[in-house]
Amino acid sequence: MLKNIVFDLGNVLVNFDSNELIYSFFNERQEEVKSFYFDSLWNEYDQGLYSVEEMIEKGVKQFPELELCIKKLMYHWTEFVIPLKDNVAYIKDLKRFGYKVYILSNIPEDDTKYLRSCGVFDNIDGGVFSYEYKKIKPDPEIFNILLEKYNLK
């Protein structure tokens, strides 16, 4: 019988739209900035390989004329991560029915702090986040970490 349910965060328990994020902070060169950050760097940020300051440094090196916008992007991007309240509330129902609920997500540390403050993790039994283990999905190792950490089958 099914006892454990594992959720992702992005577009499951929270909404995050990188287009909206980029277009909110940049009036010019949006596609270049989006490509620069979200084609590869963001995965490394999710893995915990770069701090916010290092992400700013990399962006400013690539786009020096956009320094202020890059700083705003990196200091305020979590404001664009919106909890999906109905989905988060559904976890309470699952808990009432006796399920254990876990999260497995590619996410940087600052985002987990923000989501904790929003109550997204209030009814979660545990989670594995990419920044903690320097691994991201779809690497099978991060799935194995979750299974072993919580003795899931």
Region locations from a protein language model:
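Conserved Lys-Pro-Asp/Glu-containing loop-to-beta segment of HAD-superfamily phosphomonoesterases
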Residues: 4, 136-153
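Alpha-helical elements of Rossmann-like donor-binding domains used by nucleotide-donor carbohydrate transfer enzymes
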Residues: 20-24, 40, 54, 58, ...
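Short, acidic loop-to-helix structural element flanking the phosphoryl-transfer center
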Residues: 53, 71-102, 140
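A metal-dependent, Asp-based hydrolase signature
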Residues: 43-73
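Active-site neighborhood of HAD-like aspartate-dependent phosphohydrolases
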Residues: 1-39, 47, 57
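Glycine-rich phosphate-binding loop signature in dinucleotide/nucleotide-binding domains
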Residues: 1, 96-99, 150-153
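Substrate-recognition/cap helix-loop segment adjacent to the acidic, metal-dependent catalytic center
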Residues: 86-132
